[in-house]
């Protein structure tokens, strides 16, 4: 391709509204054009990168028996009502919904579990057809409340999604491991630093679930890593530092605490460490047909993990109760909530079980109790793991070793769904005895746009984008000074020779200074630059520079061999 033919535009100035580096550079380098909030045009330059990534995905998925198809973007509401997700998604405003001329409700696809199940249910008949792996690379729509960070959180997104159907839990697990391995190979080929972490399945499903997280300081997700094990902080199980508590129970006392509403102020008032305080939070659980308030007791020095609470209690959504809701439900103010005389169900994190002679509130303003003990003063609560992991906590999967905390960008997510969706759509098969059996399902997805943004975030430098070799839109830039007709003729010859050998050169034939062209090449992220400047004119030797700064001097005779070693 010649720059005179390529429809692109670079900019000297960054977009001031771009919140993250990847968004800034992708727009500045001519890869991305913003149409509206969370909606972007993928320019010809970016589509070259996308096409290469899609080819890598196809190669790895086809190698394990995947079959590509294309599912519709427009879904009728009845499909989603089969699984109850229409109500769940519409209540949160995540769906783009519309009605056709007959008044029937539809949505633009945020995911495709319902559609794929309705299809497979009609065509699947025999166990001999299993395991089955179908996948697509297509657009998804999600009405994000706060679309931001360019391709990292957009309203219209490009994804690969795979679906597997199996005859048993064992075969489902085998398919899960195959997809896990294939996804690993995809990200290995991209040369990204990533970790696979245990995750919460969220609204997709509650079975085994893992995320592929690209390590990046900008990452939206917090991940806990210990050795080879990792977990999203939403799902991380951890063992916090232990504390010694009194063995002898002391007499309980009521103490006036006017205006003391924070844990820190309470610790100062009683001159005790935070871990001797039982703090209580009120949360609102949302279900399809009701809302429920519960209280959660936590050790004073630790934070609650709301995702774990929602998962434990099978809630569709969860939030901390507002001050007004606390006063309405408990008749007291925030800061004075506790297990004593609590009118709502009381749960507590497992780390509160060893606590003795602790301080807690009693659901009355300006009043706390000291030397409170389970069993003697309170009925034991309903315990659960509601702890938010912190750096330094011990990892139970790697005994004796602490977690390190990193930020990451989730680029892929894999799930075992069991029979949650196949039951709803009666995705069944006949076994060898003619008996009807249920299918076991898995779902898997790679965020194509997110992965490209993660590449930029992780690899970019102060000169611009640094694409992995496997994704770069062109393999080498051929650059010369505008107006230098001798160098231009040579550049044309080299360009056509490289094209004939299957390489992807970009001939910068603009009437611009050589330095300007080299800066553009670095901004765009092309791996190599062939520079036809003064050095070549004086020596007849090609000067080549890699995007990382390595320099090569290559004779015209040795140039084909150099290309085989570096561009192939």
Swiss-Prot record:
UniProt KW keywords: Aminoacyl-tRNA synthetase, ATP-binding, Cytoplasm, Ligase, Nucleotide-binding, Protein biosynthesis
InterPro entries for this protein: aa-tRNA-synt_IIb (IPR002314), aa-tRNA-synth_II (IPR006195), aa-tRNA-synth_II/BPL/LPL (IPR045864), Anticodon-bd (IPR004154), Anticodon-bd_dom_sf (IPR036621), Pro-tRNA-ligase_IIa (IPR002316), Pro-tRNA-synth_IIa_bac-type (IPR004500), Pro-tRNA-Synthase_IIa_type1 (IPR023717)
GO molecular function: aminoacyl-tRNA deacylase activity; ATP binding; proline-tRNA ligase activity
Cysteines engaged in disulfide bonds, as pairs: none
Top enzyme class: ligase
GO BP terms in the entry: prolyl-tRNA aminoacylation
Principal cellular location given in the protein's record: cytoplasm
E.C. no: 6.1.1.15
CDD domains in UniProt: ProRS-INS, ProRS_anticodon_short
GO cellular component: cytosol
Catalytic activity field: tRNA(Pro) + L-proline + ATP = L-prolyl-tRNA(Pro) + AMP + diphosphate
Subcellular location: Cytoplasm
Similarity-based family: Belongs to the class-II aminoacyl-tRNA synthetase family. ProS type 1 subfamily.
Protein role: Catalyzes the attachment of proline to tRNA(Pro) in a two-step reaction: proline is first activated by ATP to form Pro-AMP and then transferred to the acceptor end of tRNA(Pro). As ProRS can inadvertently accommodate and process non-cognate amino acids such as alanine and cysteine, to avoid such errors it has two additional distinct editing activities against alanine. One activity is designated as 'pretransfer' editing and involves the tRNA(Pro)-independent hydrolysis of activated Ala-AMP.
UniProt-listed PANTHER family: MITOCHONDRIAL RIBOSOME PROTEIN L39/PROLYL-TRNA LIGASE FAMILY MEMBER, PROLINE--TRNA LIGASE
Designated name of the protein: Proline--tRNA ligase
Species this protein is from: Chlamydia pneumoniae
């Amino acid at each position: 391709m010649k720059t005179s033919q390529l429809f692109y535009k670079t900019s000297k100035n960054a977009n001031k509204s771009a919140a993250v580096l990847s968004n800034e550079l992708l727009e500045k380098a001519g890869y991305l054009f913003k149409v509206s909030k969370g909606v972007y045009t993928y320019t010809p330059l970016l589509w070259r990168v996308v096409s290469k990534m899609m080819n890598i995905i196809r190669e790895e998925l086809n190698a394990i028996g995947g079959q590509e198809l294309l599912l519709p973007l427009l879904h009728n509401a009845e499909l989603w009502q089969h699984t109850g997700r229409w109500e769940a998604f519409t209540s949160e405003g995540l769906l783009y919904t519309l009605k056709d001329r007959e008044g029937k409700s539809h949505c633009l696809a945020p995911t495709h579990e319902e559609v794929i199940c309705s299809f497979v249910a009609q065509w699947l008949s025999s166990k001999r057809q299993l395991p089955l792996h179908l996948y697509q690379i297509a657009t998804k729509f999600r009405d994000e409340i706060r679309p931001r960070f360019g391709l990292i959180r957009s309203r219209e997104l490009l994804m690969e999604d795979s679906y597997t159907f199996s005859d048993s839990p064992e075969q489902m697990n085998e398919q899960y491991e195959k997809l896990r391995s294939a996804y690993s190979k995809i990200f290995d080929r991209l040369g990204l630093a990533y970790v696979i972490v245990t995750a919460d399945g969220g609204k997709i499903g509650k079975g085994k679930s893992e995320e592929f997280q690209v390590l990046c300081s900008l990452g939206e997700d917090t991940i806990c890593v210990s050795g080879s094990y990792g977990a999203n902080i939403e799902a991380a199980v951890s063992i916090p530092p232990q504390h010694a508590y009194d063995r002898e129970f002391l007499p309980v006392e009521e103490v006036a605490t006017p205006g003391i509403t924070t844990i820190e102020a309470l610790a100062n008032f009683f001159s005790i460490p935070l871990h001797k305080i039982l703090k209580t939070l009120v949360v609102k659980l949302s279900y399809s047909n009701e809302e429920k308030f519960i209280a959660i007791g936590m050790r004073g020095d630790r934070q609650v993990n709301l995702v774990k609470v929602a998962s434990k209690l099978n809630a569709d959504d969860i939030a901390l109760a507002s001050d007004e809701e606390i006063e309405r439900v408990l008749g007291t103010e925030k800061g004075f909530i506790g297990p004593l005389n609590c009118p709502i169900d009381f749960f507590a994190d497992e780390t509160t079980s060893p606590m003795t002679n602790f301080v807690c509130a009693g659901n009355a303003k300006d009043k706390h109790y000291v030397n409170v003990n389970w069993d003697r003063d309170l009925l034991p609560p309903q315990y659960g793991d509601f702890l938010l992991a912190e750096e330094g906590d011990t990892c139970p999967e790697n005994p004796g070793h602490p977690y390190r905390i990193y930020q990451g960008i989730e680029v892929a997510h894999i799930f075992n769904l069991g029979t949650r969706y196949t039951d709803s759509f009666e995705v069944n098969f006949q076994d060898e005895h003619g008996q009807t059996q249920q299918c076991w399902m898995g779902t898997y997805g790679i965020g194509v746009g997110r992965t490209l943004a993660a590449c930029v975030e992780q690899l970019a430098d102060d000169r611009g984008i640094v694409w992995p070799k496997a994704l770069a839109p062109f393999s080498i830039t051929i650059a010369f000074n505008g107006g230098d007709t001798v160098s231009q003729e040579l550049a044309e010859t080299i360009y056509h020779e490289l094209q004939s050998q299957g390489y992807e050169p970009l001939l910068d034939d603009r009437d611009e200074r050589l330095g300007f062209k080299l800066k553009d090449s670095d901004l765009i992220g092309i791996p190599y630059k062939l520079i036809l400047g003064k050095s070549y004119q004086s020596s007849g030797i090609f000067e080549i520079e890699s995007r990382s700064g390595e320099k090569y001097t290559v004779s015209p005779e040795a140039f084909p061999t150099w290309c085989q070693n570096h561009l192939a």
